[in-house]
Amino acid sequence: MAKYERTLNGDFNGLLRRIEDGILNGSFSASLEETSDFYENGARCSVRVFERYSYTGGNRLSMSVTLFQNGGPIHLSAVTSGGSQALFFKINTWGEETFLDCIKKIIEE
């Protein structure tokens, strides 16, 4: 598992679109598997689960992206999983780190 978290300022909807477009257009095998959105008392939470094939690992892996805002800055959490091939411990997590690099590039550009 790999994790990336940031606190950002800006437009929630614009950031969410940028993340979705950037991930889906940044990898030939990336797909948006599921979405969830909550609004309550001015707070907003959006969850996106992406999946892609890792050529280096020879397997599929997922990335869950959560955005949360309650009137102030936007909190971002991205977690990747599924890149290991071992049964009892994690080895070969390059695919997870590479997938996470996609969102880092989107956020830090």
Question: What role is predicted for each listed range?
Answer:
Residues 1-27, 35:
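Terminal, regulation- and interaction-focused segments at domain boundaries
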Residues 10, 14, 60, 94, ...:
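Conserved active-site and cofactor/substrate-binding residues in soluble primary-metabolism enzymes
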Residues 25, 38-39, 81, 107-108:
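N-terminal intrinsically disordered, cationic/polar leader segments
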Residues 32-41:
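Short Gly/Thr-rich strand-loop-strand
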Residues 43-58:
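Amphipathic, interaction-prone secondary-structure segments
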Residues 57-90:
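Beta-strand/loop substructures that line and gate deep hydrophobic ligand-binding cavities in soluble
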Residues 86-109:
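A conserved amphipathic terminal alpha-helix motif
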